[in-house]
Amino acid sequence: MLSVTLQARPCYELLEDYEKNKRVFRAAKLEFSSMAGRDVYNVSVPLLMDGAAYIAGRAETRASEISEVVFFRKTGRFCTPVCPPAVSYGECMARIRGEIVFGGVRLKTDPRDPQKIAGYRTEFYRGSTIRDLRPFAAGPEHMKDIRLVQLSDGTVGIFTRPQGNGAGKGKVGFTRVDRLEDVTREAILGAEIIPSLFTEDEWGGVNNVHLLKNGLLGVIGHIAYMSRGMTRHYFPAAFAFNPETLEYTPVKIICRRSDVLDAPAKRPDLKDVLFPGGIVRKGERADLYVGVSDATAQCVEIGDPFLEYEA
């Protein structure tokens, strides 16, 4: 039975629960070749294709936020670049109705200053392989963290991440459409906001969604807050979601920065940042793919956070 939550809990309470129950076993840094001094972080989960595993990662120099997404072939912890699409970041890959669906964020830069970001939007691509992806949908301006998932009846679930206008620093919305062709800006804007997922001083979003064997959705997301000095704190989190009723289980943190390998940060205010790409389930454990401090990426073995939702 789904244990429904009705009131958001702040990060400090979720961290207390995490420290009592955490199951983090090991972490390994992902190594990316042929990147000519660029960092690769905020990776997707691997997607199997033609007997090989591929991941997407955000690549940029340490001093810049102007980036591109690069696809890599993954062998163990070593990753070799294959081909870049024409988007900047926001890496997510999934299979929907037999097709690969890739979502990424395209940046708009200021024509007077190419290093200044003037806007962005999420774009979606589909294809039989990563080499023949073609655009099919785009989200609203200034919205990222949009994720698609195939539901048990074959329809497509859409998680959104509105900000402002009642959504504060960032909330999560949900809607569903019949087909990928129905994923439109209007459908995304019409998503119903899931209430009380985060407190008003905190924010979060959805990163990776799994269809569980009971029809619920296992959600890997992030929850975040800002402390003094504009220091950001990001934590991978999980919950189960009922797409029929919009009910969800209490959010739980599943990893934190101090429990992975030491690594450099892009800036001091990003030291305490783990940004999840998602998990690969493997029995009672799972591999969590995370970007670390906006500079590197790691694969962290944790206890499978979805097992309790399928019991």
Regions found by a protein language model. Name each.
Residues 207-208:
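Functionally critical, mid-to-C-terminal surface segments that flank or help form catalytic/ligand
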Residues 202-203, 273:
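Conserved glycosyltransferase catalytic-site signature
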Residues 1-88, 94-144, 149-201, 211-269, ...:
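Beta-rich carbohydrate-recognition and catalytic domains
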